[in-house]
């Protein structure tokens, strides 16, 4: 189903309840988007739906409204511990956002309780909250929801609570599968009743999503909503009001261009995407030092407990910069983002579209800019063909301030900056090697010297990808980097302790080697004789037919060794007698 109409909420073939209409009015949504007008009537008429629509098209309301209407039409009112609807989404940030939207509606329906179940906090708190307040509508991430289904010993039998389930929604289904949640989803589906309505919402259609549709939906109506306008015939996958730009510049110029751009747009709100968590940590700290009077925040997937707080705070800001990885690339609705800046291209073409889609949402205008190296220019044609994503070139600014020496000075002054830079460089190269478009993003074509300059490295790190390579265009600093201290006194104190411990261990190790090397000849000889004696004894016990003369020689050597140990003979005499004894026995054996 592709032909859909837009219009006011009253134009729907099914009437919405007064409370829902009041909530829509409070939110300022006077008209429907195409995905909403296509999905809501079908979902409300008890159909399973599989909806594909471009990012930023208003999919959240397309399932929140039907959920409320279906629960309002229930013949039997839901009890506190009964779950009527579950919304599963891939990230905490998206779950928080959906929960906030839902709150705008449920405040008009006090009889419905809702609960947010996400990682990054104590699961027992979720259990206690559910037991106290209930959860008629659950918004959850897959990992936490699966965990709570299995926690029967904590006084909550969630499997019993979901027997009353009417609606299941899988939001950003393609991302759920991309992030490896397939086994969790299958485990969750096994707990849910078969008689339910299911909605699957996605920005892209993949074979994995198709498999999930077959497994979780019954005779679904498929909805595919495309953008209007000239590009619609080519199924453009980015919003039509999004202006997409690209800039070609060398690796050692890219950071200066980024800072210049951000300084020129200080009053606006930006997302800056990097390829790895380590790059976010490093460049985020650099931007904090170089761009004043602007709120700069960092967020990435390895932040387990801070992410929720940072995301919520940034959403409330009128302006600022959020430095992030692709954890922020999907479904997240941050109000009034003016620019999405992709410092590093993402690992896949579909992720490029989702990053851009963080701006120009629900009919608003927005802009996106991706920085590319000269060797990556063919990526533009690839995006045009693969993702139907039209782009315009933005020329690099001339005579921008060179900030890399300042970044180097920061690394020389603080070991934390130096180490972050090294980790960021290594992680970038490792991520580059795994890029989906490896015909364009080829690691062998990278200018490592220019790249190291762009990271303001003090020296090249040791890593397999650089083994055997020479970098005449890169000059490492003459400073011994081991002497660079941490600015944090506690960290530096701890580092000095570790260095001292390592020094002692090294000295002990060298001392042992020296001791073994300088051990007296007699002790070494004694050790060999002891070993020889044990070998002879073992052979004797095994029934060896050793000659009597050999045994006599061994016993004689042993007697001499005992006399040497007691000091009755000197080492010189011991050596003389030992040699003479062996010669005598050899002569006897020859006769």
Swiss-Prot record:
Motif (Q motif): 9-37
Motif window: DEAD box: 171-174
Keywords: ATP-binding, Coiled coil, Helicase, Hydrolase, Nucleotide-binding, Nucleus, Ribosome biogenesis, RNA-binding, rRNA processing, rRNA-binding
Biased composition range(s): Basic residues: 514-538
Region described as Important for nuclear localization: spans on this chain: 533-562
Reaction it catalyzes: ATP + H2O = ADP + phosphate + H(+)
RNA-binding among keywords: yes
Coiled coil: 486-542
UniProt-listed Pfam families: CTE_SPB4, DEAD, Helicase_C
One GO cellular component, as annotated: nucleolus
GO terms assigned for molecular function: ATP binding; ATP hydrolysis activity; RNA binding; RNA helicase activity
InterPro entries: DEAD/DEAH_box_helicase_dom (IPR011545), Helicase_ATP-bd (IPR014001), Helicase_C-like (IPR001650), P-loop_NTPase (IPR027417), RNA-helicase_DEAD-box_CS (IPR000629), RNA_helicase_DEAD_Q_motif (IPR014014), SPB4-like_CTE (IPR025313)
Region of interest called Disordered, as start-end residue ranges on this chain: 482-559, 571-591
Positions contributing to ATP binding: 53-60
Subcellular location: Nucleus, Nucleoplasm
EC number: 3.6.4.13
Chief localization: nucleus
Limits of the Helicase C-terminal domain: 254-402
Helicase ATP-binding domain sequence ranges: 40-223
Biological role: Probable ATP-binding RNA helicase. Has ATPase activity and is involved in the maturation of precursor large subunit rRNAs.
Domain notes: The Q motif is unique to and characteristic of the DEAD box family of RNA helicases and controls ATP binding and hydrolysis.
Subunit structure, interactors included: Interacts with 28S rRNA. Interacts with double-stranded RNA substrates in vitro; the interaction stimulates ATPase activity.
Family assignment from sequence similarity: Belongs to the DEAD box helicase family. DDX55/SPB4 subfamily.
Name used for this protein in its record: ATP-dependent RNA helicase DDX55
Taxonomic source organism: Gallus gallus (Chicken)
Protein encoded by which gene: DDX55
């Amino acid at each position: 189903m592709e032909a859909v109409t837009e219009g006011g909420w009253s134009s729907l073939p099914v009437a919405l309840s007064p409370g829902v209409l009041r909530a829509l009015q409070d939110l300022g949504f006077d008209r429907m988007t195409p995905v909403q007008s296509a999905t809501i009537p079908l979902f409300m008429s008890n159909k399973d739906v599989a909806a594909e629509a471009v990012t930023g098209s208003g999919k959240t309301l397309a399932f929140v409204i039907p959920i409320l209407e279906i629960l309002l039409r229930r013949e039997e009112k839901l009890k506190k511990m009964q779950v009527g609807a579950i919304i599963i989404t891939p990230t905490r940030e998206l779950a928080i956002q959906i929960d906030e939207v839902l709150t705008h509606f449920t405040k008009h329906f006090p009889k419905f309780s809702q609960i947010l179940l996400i990682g990054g906090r104590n699961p027992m708190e979720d259990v206690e909250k559910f037991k106290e307040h209930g959860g008629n509508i659950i918004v959850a991430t897959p990992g936490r929801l699966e965990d709570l289904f299995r926690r029967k010993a904590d006084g909550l039998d969630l499997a019993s609570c979901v027997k009353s389930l009417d609606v299941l929604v899988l939001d950003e289904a393609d991302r759920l599968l991309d992030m490896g949640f397939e086994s969790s989803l299958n485990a969750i589906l096994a707990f849910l009743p078969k008689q339910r309505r299911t909605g699957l919402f996605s920005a892209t259609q993949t074979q994995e999503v198709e498999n999930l549709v077959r497994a979780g939906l019954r005779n679904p109506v498929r909805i595919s909503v495309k953008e209007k306008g000239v590009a619609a015939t080519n199924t453009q996958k980015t919003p039509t009001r999004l202006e997409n730009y690209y800039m070609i510049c060398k690796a050692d110029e890219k950071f200066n261009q980024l800072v210049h751009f951000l300084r020129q747009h200080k009053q606006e709100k930006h997302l800056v995407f990097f390829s790895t968590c380590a790059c976010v940590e490093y460049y985020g700290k650099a931007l904090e030092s170089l761009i004043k009077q602007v709120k700069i925040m960092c967020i990435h997937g390895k932040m387990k407990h801070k992410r929720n707080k940072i995301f919520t705070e940034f959403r409330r800001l009128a302006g600022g910069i959020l430095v992030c990885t692709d954890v922020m690339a999907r479904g997240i609705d941050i109000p009034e983002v003016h620019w999405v800046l992709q410092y590093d291209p993402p690992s896949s073409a579909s992720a490029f579209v989702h990053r851009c889609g963080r701006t120009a949402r629900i009919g608003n205008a927005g802009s996106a800019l991706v920085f590319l190296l000269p060797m990556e220019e063919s990526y533009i044609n690839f995006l045009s063909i693969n993702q139907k994503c039209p782009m315009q070139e933005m020329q690099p600014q001339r005579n921008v301030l060179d900030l890399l020496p300042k970044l180097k000075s920061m690394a020389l002054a603080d070991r934390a900056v130096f180490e972050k830079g090294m980790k960021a460089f290594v992680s970038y190269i490792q991520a580059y090697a795994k890029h989906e478009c490896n015909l364009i993003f080829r690691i062998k074509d990278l200018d490592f010297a220019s790249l190291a300059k762009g990271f303001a490295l003090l020296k090249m790190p040791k890593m397999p990808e650089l083994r055997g390579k020479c970098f005449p265009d890169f000059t490492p600093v003459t400073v011994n980097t081991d002497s660079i201290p941490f600015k944090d006194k506690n960290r530096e104190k701890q580092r000095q302790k570790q260095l001292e411990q390592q020094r002692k261990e090294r000295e002990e190790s060298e001392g042992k080697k020296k001791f073994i090397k300088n051990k007296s000849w007699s002790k070494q000889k004694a050790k060999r004789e002891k070993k020889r004696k044990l070998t002879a004894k073992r052979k004797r016990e095994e029934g060896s037919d050793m000659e009597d003369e050999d045994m006599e020689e061994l016993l004689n050597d042993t007697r001499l060794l005992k006399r040497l140990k007691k000091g009755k003979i000197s080492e010189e005499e011991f050596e003389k007698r030992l040699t003479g004894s062996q010669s005598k026995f050899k002569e006897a054996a020859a006769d």
